[in-house]
Amino acid sequence: MSNSDIRSFFGGGNAQKKPKVSPTPTSPKPKRSLKKKRIVLSDDEDGTIENSKVPASKSKVQKRNESEDISHSLPSIVHEDDKLVGSDGVSTTPDEYFEQQSTRSRSKPRIISNKETTTSKDVVHPVKTENFANDLDTTSDSKPVVHQTRATRKPAQPKAEKSTTSKSKSHTTTATTHTSRSSKSKGLPRFSDEVSQALKNVPLIDVDSMGVMAPGTFYERAATTQTPGSKPVPEGNSDCLSGISFVITGILETLTRQEATDLIKQYGGKVTGAPSVRTDFILLGENAGPRKVETIKQHKIPAINEDGLFYLITHLPASGGTGAAAQAAQQKKEQEEKKILETVARMDDSNKKESQPSQIWTSKYAPTSLKDICGNKGVVQKLQKWLQDYHKNRKSNFNKPGPDGLGLYKAVLLSGPPGIGKTTAAHLVAKLEGYDVLELNASDTRSKRLLDEQLFGVTDSQSLAGYFGTKANPVDMAKSRLVLIMDEIDGMSSGDRGGVGQLNMIIKKSMIPIICICNDRAHPKLRPLDRTTFDLRFRRPDANSMRSRIMSIAYREGLKLSPQAVDQLVQGTQSDMRQIINLLSTYKLSCSEMTPQNSQAVIKNSEKHIVMKPWDICSRYLHGGMFHPSSKSTINDKLELYFNDHEFSYLMVQENYLNTTPDRIRQEPPKMSHLKHLELISSAANSFSDSDLVDSMIHGPQQHWSLMPTHALMSCVRPASFVAGSGSRQIRFTNWLGNNSKTNKLYRMLREIQVHMRLKVSANKLDLRQHYIPILYESLPVKLSTGHSDVVPEIIELMDEYYLNREDFDSITELVLPADAGEKLMKTIPTAAKSAFTRKYNSSSHPIAFFGSSDVLPMKGSAQREVPDVEDAIEAEDEMLEEASDSEAANEEDIDLSKDKFISVPKKPKKRTKAKAEASSSSSTSRRSRKKTA
């Protein structure tokens, strides 16, 4: 396929060849090398080319005299396009001019190019226009050209000539800015006649008369915008905004900022973030920021609204006309098409074998070289460098860090979002470096025991192929190297108990390179790998690095794809290359062309559902964007956010709702903002209380799970609508889990104390906590903190009177208020007093109120007997009578008394070792021999 074919394939309306502007035969266009040359015409010879500069051998005085002599006898003639403009302002052709000069004195006229006149210090062009539209009309013949005559000409200065269109002088008018930018494109005007006429008639906005947004009025005025979609979006020519740069600021009338950006990019325009000298138009909405307004006024950038944008789309020609800006954009597009052709040719060379029709695209177009990987080139090169030098670093015992510090690590950790090429890069680099690959991913069970079994004998210097090599098929020892790839290590579940810790131990002892891959680098379970792995972080590639690869795949499959559609696919999938290829393969089954409008529908229908984390859910709720009057988030979208994690989402919102500055108080005066803030917090707290009632019905005896949407509304959506705004602190994890666990623990301690004291007191748990615990705290731990040894018997006597044990003593210390008072008191008790109390308590017997049978636990190895059915019970009655005695004996054996804390079981005597037995036997024989001798 030729270059014209591929332009028609990707560009659509850009396939037509643009006519080139050819100069007239009477005035040939000078070459590029004649920029600073003069054409000198004499009577007897043709035009000769001489340098504009005087040779260095001549003095400054001679140079000035020669220029004055020539200026005395020659009129100034400026070469403008293909005509000669004299000092009287009349434009003639070169032939007509020389016919008029034949009757005059035969002198040597000189022709000064328009390039030289614009850059000369002697020629001055006072350009002062009234508006931006007149400045863009560069093809008008009425533009005055001022020339210097003998009377007004200044003597030539010996200094070097400087351009009058420098940046320091280009701020006077907008026209000078556009003129200086157009001079870079071989003398062509920046915009063609048709484009200039359309830009001249575009309705502009007077920025000087526009007010600056007052503080605290952004969200109030946002509600006055029109209904989205009330104005129809026009359809224009293909790439009609090519070569035009926009900046969007403020709140637009009917379009959101994202919709306006997509619309401009759809027609070939460029959208930047901040206004500058290179900005052509400002798409201005209501309540623009004061800094951007000052920049617009400073650079005098023309501003338009939505009507102006729609006017440009409907009136500009296809491909932006024939101006310099449009040609520059077209050249950039041709370079991208050339790059696509090179990628397609490289893919054809790598895939010489015909692929199967049933092969999926992700496998069919898997990268075969490092050039095929989109983005993260530096990270992939570091991975390849580490794998190349692994065995060299192993010989040095990993003590030489090298320039990047790679020589100190036996393993690397690749982290980054899914679908950006981490696993592909690992396999490709291993293949290029001649390694065999052993991969363990999330589908494999990677517990501590199984890792030991699977990797036993593998983490040495042998290759995996070496285990299967035979004499008939010997293994190439040059490739007898193995690399272990552990994919998705952050996905090790509870079934992979101890897997990360065992992997860390394997890395320390391994003799082969290990590549670990994860998505969430900040996961707590990956902390053991911080000191044993080198961190290589992959980032999401941008659309520029992915465009050529995606379009080359579409070109090979016969799918027409525009660059704007590629940008939307990259943005919608968050640079997930795998998902983009799968979307294209599915779309190709029904259609053969994808437009930007179709790509938006495909992304929305095939949107990948990503389960959000509790931190992200809380941030979305408490951020003010979801509850803005101009937000397009529906109530279903807000409820769906809750169901990403319905167990923690409302707890996170309740933990962080006090740390925001609500948007609703921005409209209030400073004196009333604090009161309004308290009222909003009170409303949010009441909503949380109502959600607790709903939650008790969901998790109560009846379990009304149909109330989950109501709970989402009352616990997340409604409270966040009151306090949503800007947050000044980081999102904190909920403390409810820890507090709830501690509360249950304290309740259990209080219940045990009440059970033990029921023989002496009749108080319930509430009375016991309010009246008895403070007195017992003063009589037991506080008295022990005095350090006197005579108080120990009194403390033990009081404990025995109320049937309190040693664990109850610690519980009383923990139940006291404030929460850390008991812990601080125990630190002040002398060690001698603690030891005396422990010895005294353990050496004496204490009364026990009662204990449950559940305190005596059966042995672990005993199995429970199955209960027979009713039919089997009648038949097995005789057998049960016979086995009754045996079962009773078995139950007695099953009881493990060592588990009972109230029964002290004597310890079994330790077996003597062989050496001690021999020593004792030898000592006994020696004693017997001494007795005999005696």
Swiss-Prot record:
Keyword Nucleus belongs to the record: yes
Residue ranges of every copy of the BRCT domain listed in the record: 236-326
Extent of Acidic residues compositional bias: 876-895
Disulfide-bonded cysteines: none
Subcellular locations according to the entry: Nucleus, Nucleolus
Keywords of the record: ATP-binding, Cell cycle, Cell division, DNA replication, DNA-binding, Nucleotide-binding, Nucleus, Phosphoprotein
Residues at which ATP binds: T362, C374, G416, P417, P418, G419, I420, G421, K422, T423, N519
Chain intervals with Basic and acidic residues compositional bias: 118-128
Biased composition annotated in UniProt, kind: Low complexity: 165-186
Phosphoserine, modified sites: S27
InterPro entries hit by this protein: AAA+_ATPase, ATPase_AAA_core, BRCT_dom, BRCT_dom_sf, DNA_pol3_clamp-load_cplx_C, DNA_replication_fac_RFC1_C, P-loop_NTPase, RFC1
GO biological process: cell division; DNA strand elongation involved in mitotic DNA replication; mitotic DNA replication leading strand elongation; UV-damage excision repair
Top-level taxon: Eukaryota
Compositional bias ranges of the Polar residues kind: 89-104
Region (Disordered) location: 1-190, 876-934
GO molecular function annotations of the record: ATP binding; ATP hydrolysis activity; chromatin binding; DNA binding; DNA clamp loader activity
One Gene Ontology CC term in the entry: nuclear DNA replication factor C complex
Compositional bias per record (Basic residues), positions renumbered to this chain: 29-39
Gene3D superfamilies: 1.10.8.60, 1.20.272.10, BRCT domain (3.40.50.10190), P-loop containing nucleotide triphosphate hydrolases (3.40.50.300)
Family that this chain belongs to: Belongs to the activator 1 large subunit family.
Quaternary structure (record): Heteropentamer of subunits rfc1, rfc2, rfc3, rfc4 and rfc5 that forms a complex (RFC) with PCNA in the presence of ATP. Interacts with cdc24.
General function of this protein: The elongation of primed DNA templates by DNA polymerase delta and epsilon requires the action of the accessory proteins PCNA and activator 1. Subunit 1 is essential for cell cycle progression. It may associate with components of the DNA replication machinery and serve to enhance the efficiency of DNA replication.
Protein name (database record): Replication factor C subunit 1
Provenance organism: Schizosaccharomyces pombe (strain 972 / ATCC 24843) (Fission yeast)
